[in-house]
Each structure stands twice: as structure tokens, then as C-alpha cells.
Regions:
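Short, small-residue-biased leader/transition segments that mark boundaries at the very start
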Residues: 1-7
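Active-site rim beta-loop-alpha module in soluble metabolic enzymes
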Residues: 8-28, 62-79
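Short coil/turn connectors at secondary-structure junctions
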Residues: 9-12, 51-55, 60, 113-116, ...
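Alpha-helical scaffold segments in soluble metabolic enzymes
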Residues: 10, 46-50, 64, 104-112
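Conserved mixed alpha/beta catalytic, RNA-binding, or beta-rich assembly cores of soluble enzyme
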Residues: 13-55, 59
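Active-site loop/turn elements of alpha/beta-hydrolase fold enzymes
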Residues: 59-62, 123
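ATP/nucleoside-binding phosphotransfer catalytic cores, i.e., glycine-rich phosphate-binding loops
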Residues: 67-140
Length: 140
């Protein structure tokens, strides 16, 4: 986290925590592959928290988080509180391995400190989302 903080403090936007890699464990001085996944969304939320960021931006394939996704009554969400997100999670509104981890990571970040905001949106709409013009903002 130290090098990321130096870069951040220089005024540079930090893009990190990509996918990939092979998880291993060390036994008897040897490395062995192990079934594990480091989720990019959760890792990004944790890094943003450790960097004391005000905003976490999670980029995805849709402009907004939606309920009833893919159905005639689909509704894009402009804002989402962690409590609302939990309700929708209980209703199974978000696909596991797709939107669910993004929403959970956004909730975790938003709840980690007052005033924090997580934005979920398209790469092409990131600037507009940061300006508050689009995307889904998750905050307390």
C-alpha cells in the first residue's frame, strides 16, 4: 500500500488490483497451487479503504446497477444505500459472480467511513459518473 500512497499523494490516479495470478500455499518449503479466488471488487474496496480514499469507482459492463435485470420491469438505480442493497441481495436481485460482488464491495467501502461513496458504472461513463450525472452511487 505504501507505493500506491506515494503515487496517490503525487496527484496521480491509481488504477490497480487487476485479476490474474495463481494462488499458492507454502508447505514444507514448497509452493503448491490451491483453489482460491481473490475477487477484484473486494480487493479494490479494501485497497481504497486502506488508502483512505473518498470514492471507489467500480467499472463494469452496464451504466447502472439494476433490479429486475433483463426483465420488462428492469429499473436502473441512481443511488443505493447499504440497507437497500442488503434488501435486494436477500431478494436475489444481483447475479453471483457478476453484479453481486460489485454491490457487496461498494457496500463495504461505503460503510467503512462516513462520507465515502462507491460508484458503479461503465468505463465510457466514468467521468460523468464521478460528476454525479450517471452510474449508481452507493453511500450511507
Amino acid at each position: 500500500v505504501g507505493s500506491e500512497m506515494c503515487i496517490r499523494d503525487s496527484g496521480t490516479v491509481v488504477i490497480t488490483v487487476g485479476g490474474g495470478g495463481i494462488p499458492v500455499v507454502c508447505r514444507d518449503g514448497k509452493l503448491y497451487g490451491t483453489p482460491a479466488v481473490i475477487d477484484k471488487d473486494f480487493a479494490s474496496a479494501k485497497l481504497a479503504e486502506l488508502l483512505d480514499a473518498d470514492m471507489l469507482v467500480i467499472l463494469t459492463a452496464v451504466e447502472k446497477v439494476a433490479i429486475n435485470f433483463g426483465k420488462p420491469d428492469q429499473k436502473g438505480l441512481d443511488t443505493l444505500t447499504p440497507d437497500e442493497a442488503r434488501k435486494y441481495i436477500d431478494e436475489k436481485q444481483f447475479a453471483p459472480g457478476s453484479m453481486l460482488p460489485k454491490v457487496q464491495a461498494a457496500m463495504s467501502f461505503a460503510e467503512s467511513k462516513p462520507g465515502r461513496v462507491a460508484l458503479i458504472t461503465l468505463l465510457e461513463k466514468a467521468a460523468e459518473g464521478i460528476e454525479g450525472k450517471t452510474g449508481t452511487r452507493v453511500q450511507m
